[in-house]
Amino acid sequence: MEAATEWLLENTPITKSECTTIRESVVDGDTGGYGVFVNFTKLRTLKGEKDSKFELLRIPRSATISMTSIRDILAKSTSENAVTASIKGHLTAFLSDENHHAFINETNLIVIYLVLKAILSDNKTYKLTGFASFYLNEVLLKTFVPLPCNTFQEDADKWNQYYKEYLNFPQQLFIEIINRFISARFLGMNYEKLISTVYCSVISRILEIPESSGEDTDDFFVSPTLVPLLDFVNHDNDHRNAHFDIDLRTNDIVLYLELDDIDSTVEEAQVFISYAPVEELVHFEQIYGFLPKSNNVQVWCYRFDEDFLSTYHYNGINVSHFYKCMRVRPSFQILILPSEVLINDCIVEFGELLILFSQHLQDPKKISFQLSETNDSYCSILKDKCGTETTKLLDKEECLEEFFGEHDEIENYEKTLKEFKSFLSKYITFRREKISSINLLSQNSSFTAFWQKEINLLDSLKGQFESKKEVMWYEKYGNDEKIKIPTVPFPPPSWIDYENMRV
């Protein structure tokens, strides 16, 4: 990548400070990746005494790839040149197909645009030059990103076999859409690997860059943008020492080193920014292809193994079928602390998991639900204050209100939680045995890191169960106002959850 970096600095308006270098990263586990470094000896001769930040990189908008690039293509006359005419024709065809409308967003259009440029670059009829073509050929197409959706990695079969519940279905579906579209437009050619490479490279490198809404307003919006050289800066929340912003005068994108916490004893350090303030590990694996290390609280949005759910029965009810009928996604959040792991029991999604195990009938031999005659829904069995049982068709929100909504339902919640913990303990035994038999192809792969992280989490939960230590966040820290629980959304569904959650 050294040659690509030099070309970009010589042939685009991108500027780099004298104290900044770009070379192979020193981050643990970052095999073959690149990073940005700052030389503090040189920095001290360049910065002002009262400066709180220092400019390391400046990237004008003309040296980026965003929706602006695509709008320019669509606005140009097809008579200007053959390349423009071809790309515009293919883009217009993609946008015109109603089956594609659900997939049209800025990031996906950038992917389509670059896939088309890459295909035309292979065609000797067209001669593609300029910054975007160089960046595509020398950076994006030469970067292998092992996202779970990348079917051209050596662990692709293992992702499908052991982690199908974590495969991002919208990603998979969009890649399939592109493959079908390109196959129809370029008959007899197979571009599946190229499409996968471009998609994974773009997804992992694209940044949300602020843009002004106009000259007469202070409002901003964010636009997905590929920013050369800035995309070499790695993520580390524990060692973050830089951030990027826009220069309001020029609209350039600027990487700033933060000078407040500079260690005067070191000569050089790697530059780090934050990709996300809270690290949700499934998101990082799906988008960036790695798991960050941190001493801060991290989150794993854990999805139960469908093989276990589909064969396990609780009081005669198939767990997988129940959650499907109730439109419950069988996932929960594991909060990873330095010395323990806890389950986030403060979110609605966790309450939805508990519905099946409700003990409000006060009889462990009785189940709170009854399968309908059509086999596609469950009726809830309720008991009034006189002990009379009635059967009602309730959705998951109504079940939460009926079972756990009142103050006098605390006893039921505690009994229900006990049942869930018993279920979870059995699950951990099943899952641990299943994944322990995996024959790892590489000790340094993204798949291996993900597998090892799950092993560690399951072992931690099992150890806490066996030593009678609390595994629920609220039960342990709910009354401690100093400890804040991180808030993160669940990642997009796998195809299993997508099918189950469809109305």
Curated annotation (Swiss-Prot):
Gene Ontology CC terms: cytosol
Q: Where in the cell is it found?
A: Cytoplasm, Cytosol
Q: Is S-adenosyl-L-methionine among the key words of this record?
A: yes
Q: Does the keyword Signal apply?
A: no
Q: What EC designation does it have?
A: 2.1.1.59
Major place of residence: cytoplasm
- Give a short account of what the protein does: Methyltransferase which mediates trimethylation of cytochrome c (CYC1).
Q: What is this protein called?
A: Cytochrome c lysine N-methyltransferase 1
List the taxonomic lineage.
Answer: Eukaryota, Fungi, Dikarya, Ascomycota, Saccharomycotina
Gene name?
CTM1
